[in-house]
Amino acid sequence: RKKNPELSCWYSPADFHRFTKIKFVQSKFEPKIGAISTKQWSTLKGTEFPFSEHNYLNALEESSCVGEESGWLPCHLTLWEKKQLQGAVCLYEKYNGYGEYIFDWGWANAYEKHGLNYYPKLVSAIPFTPATGLKLLVHPEADTRNVRKKLLEEALLCMRSRNCSSLHFLFITAEELPVFESMGFLIRHSFQFHWKNNFYQDFDEFLGSLKRKRRKEIIRERRQIQQQMINVEVLEGEAILVEHINYMYE
């Protein structure tokens, strides 16, 4: 396992007066990703990241994984120059802290103790997915610096217009960090543990790379699975039937 640094940032309305709006192109907020064409969306840098693909985000909305019932209300920000998409941010109005994998219960409790509303808050993240990827999506031929600033300006305006307590960008990239810092966002550093495959010849070689305590734990857990007669079967492609999907959903 390897510790990987994760970056998230937070912004409160209190300091909004620091900024002057950047004159740029037309901005829109869309309640559904489907309102933006797949072709236009795919021109932006960052949408090659699997969880930022148009089809993936649309599937979350169409399946109701994202929506009012789950507390993730889409309000995706787009910037346009004439009919060309210049930039975008996946934004969600949140009414709970679930599915983010960045825990801010302490902030929510502090707001409540002082008689303030922490929810709704405005969040840019991939729902239910703690994976690092670009959050400020920009067309490769656009002025990246100015488009990123304009995206943040418009997101802050959205935060105020919707009476949200704060604006959050979760699991941002190091590439984006300077623009957040320049605009006064608070940066939060955290860690994830990622397993790396060091080209082990077999499972025994992997076990041999561990400390004695961890090795014994894994051996014991695997023995318990065998004793309970649990079988693991991997299904792919057409072998996955509707009844499998329904069972998994339940």
Stretches with model-predicted labels:
Residues N4, C9-S12, F16-E250:
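N-acyltransferase acceptor-side catalytic subdomain
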